[in-house]
C-alpha cells in the first residue's frame, strides 16, 4: 500500500482544531482508495516563539525536507507580532522549498449563502494564482532615524524575469485545464517600473497560448469586478501582494473565508509543497470548537491531487459539496450550530460511502 509521509504543523488557535478534522477526512479517503499516511507532528507556533524566541528550530527546513508534503493549520497570536510569525515560519518554508505558486480556488457551493444577490451555485468558479516568493513581500529595506520626526521606512519590491515568467506560465497551463481564460492583476498606471515589467511578461507569455483568452485590470477596478461580476473570471494571476488581497476577497464573495483552501506549490516537485486554509488562527473563537474545518479539509483535497491521487481528491471535494448542500451539520459561520468535529465527521462519512 502506498504511504505518504506528511509533516503536520497545526500551529496556533483554531489550527489545532481544524487540522485533526482534515486528517480524519484524508484518512477515510486513504481507506477507500487504497493508500495511507504517516503523519509527523511538529509543534511549531507562536507559543514556541514565546518559549524559545524562534518560530521553528534552526534546522527546521532540514527537518521538513524529506516529507512528501506539509499540512499546516494556522499561524498567529496576539502575543507575537504578525510579521514575526509570518517571517519566522511560513515565508522561510515557501522560499526555501521554492513554493512560488500560491493557488486558491474560489467556488460558490449549494447551501452557502453569498452576500451577493442573485448568484447560484456553479456560477462563480475561479482560481487565484498568486506569486509566492518575491514581489512586494521582500525583506530588502530598513528604517532610519527611528523614533524621531525624520524617521524613514523603506521596503523594496523585487520582480525577476524568472520569477514572474514561471508563475505566469503556471497560470496559463492551469487555464488550459479549465475555461481557457487568464486575467492579470496590475497597477502599471501608478507603479511605473515593476508593474509595466509584469505586464510586458504577461503579454510575452500569452503569445505562446493562442488558445487562451487574456485580459488585465488595475487592481482597484479588479476588486470591484470581483464583487459585481465574479462570473467573468477563470484564472486570475497576480503579484504577491495583489494575489494575497484578491484571494481573501474571493472567498468572502462566495460566503465564508472558513471554507477557502490554498496550496503553496513547488510545481517541479523538487521540494515538498504546503497546504493550508486561507483563514487565520482566529484567537477570538479558538478553544470553543466552532471553527469551520472545510478550508482545512479542502486544502487536504488539493494535497491529494498534488500527491497523484485525483480520484481521492474528487471524492473529498464531492463530500464537501454534498455535506454543504444536504447535511444538517454546519458551523456558525455558515448558519448552523454544529461543532468543528461534527462537521468534520459528516464530511468523513460521505467520503467513506461509495
State where each predicted segment sits.
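Flexible, glycine/charged-enriched surface loops at secondary-structure junctions
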Residues: 34-40, 178-186, 209-217, 309-317, ...
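Buried hydrophobic positions in well-ordered alpha/beta secondary-structure cores of metabolic enzymes
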Residues: 12-15, 68, 129, 171, ...
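N-terminal beta-loop-helix "entrance" segment that forms/cooperates
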Residues: 34-57, 226
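Glycine-rich phosphate/nucleotide-binding loop
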Residues: 48-49, 226-331
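Short acidic loop-to-helix transition motifs that present clustered carboxylates
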Residues: 111, 217-224
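Glycine-rich phosphate/diphosphate-binding loop of Rossmann-like nucleotide-binding domains
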Residues: 7-24, 28-30, 148-220
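Buried hydrophobic packing segments
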Residues: 22, 26, 202, 296-304, ...
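N-terminal glycine-rich phosphate/adenylate-binding segment common to multiple enzyme folds
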Residues: 50-154, 241
Amino acid at each position: 500500500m502506498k504511504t505518504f509521509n506528511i509533516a503536520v504543523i497545526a500551529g496556533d488557535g483554531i489550527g489545532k482544531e481544524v487540522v485533526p478534522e482534515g486528517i480524519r477526512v484524508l484518512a477515510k479517503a486513504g481507506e477507500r482508495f487504497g493508500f495511507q499516511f504517516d503523519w509527523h507532528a511538529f509543534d511549531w507556533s507562536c507559543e514556541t516563539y514565546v518559549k524559545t524566541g524562534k518560530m521553528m528550530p534552526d534546522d527546521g527546513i532540514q527537518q521538513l525536507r524529506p516529507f512528501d508534503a506539509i499540512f499546516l493549520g494556522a499561524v498567529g497570536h496576539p502575543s507575537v507580532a504578525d510579521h514575526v510569525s509570518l517571517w519566522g515560519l511560513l515565508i522561510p518554508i515557501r522560499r526555501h522549498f521554492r513554493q512560488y505558486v500560491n493557488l486558491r480556488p474560489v467556488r460558490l457551493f449549494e447551501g452557502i449563502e453569498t452576500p451577493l444577490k442573485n448568484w447560484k451555485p456553479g456560477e462563480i468558479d475561479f482560481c487565484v494564482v498568486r506569486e509566492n516568493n518575491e514581489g512586494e513581500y521582500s525583506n530588502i529595506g530598513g528604517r532610519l532615524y527611528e523614533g524621531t520626526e525624520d524617521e524613514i521606512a523603506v521596503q523594496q519590491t523585487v520582480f525577476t524575469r524568472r520569477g514572474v515568467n514561471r508563475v505566469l506560465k503556471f497560470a496559463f497551463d492551469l487555464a488550459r485545464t479549465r475555461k481557457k481564460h487568464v486575467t492579470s492583476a496590475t497597477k502599471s498606471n501608478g507603479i511605473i517600473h515593476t508593474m509595466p515589467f509584469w505586464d510586458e511578461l504577461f503579454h510575452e507569455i500569452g503569445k505562446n497560448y493562442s488558445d487562451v483568452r487574456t485580459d488585465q485590470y488595475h487592481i482597484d477596478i479588479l476588486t470591484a469586478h470581483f464583487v459585481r461580476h465574479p462570473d467573468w473570471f477563470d484564472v486570475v494571476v497576480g503579484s504577491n501582494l495583489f494575489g494575497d488581497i484578491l484571494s481573501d476577497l474571493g472567498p468572502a464573495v462566495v460566503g465564508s473565508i472558513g471554507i477557502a483552501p490554498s496550496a503553496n506549490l513547488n510545481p517541479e516537485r523538487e521540494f515538498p509543497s504546503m497546504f493550508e486554509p486561507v483563514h487565520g488562527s482566529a484567537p477570538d473563537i479558538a478553544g470553543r470548537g466552532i471553527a469551520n474545518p472545510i478550508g482545512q479539509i479542502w486544502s487536504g483535497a488539493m494535497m491529494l491531487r498534488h500527491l497523484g491521487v485525483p480520484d481521492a481528491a474528487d471524492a473529498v471535494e464531492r463530500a464537501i459539496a454534498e455535506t454543504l448542500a444536504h447535511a444538517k451539520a454546519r458551523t456558525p459561520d455558515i448558519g448552523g450550530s454544529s461543532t468543528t468535529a461534527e462537521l468534520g465527521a459528516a464530511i468523513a462519512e460521505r467520503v467513506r460511502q461509495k
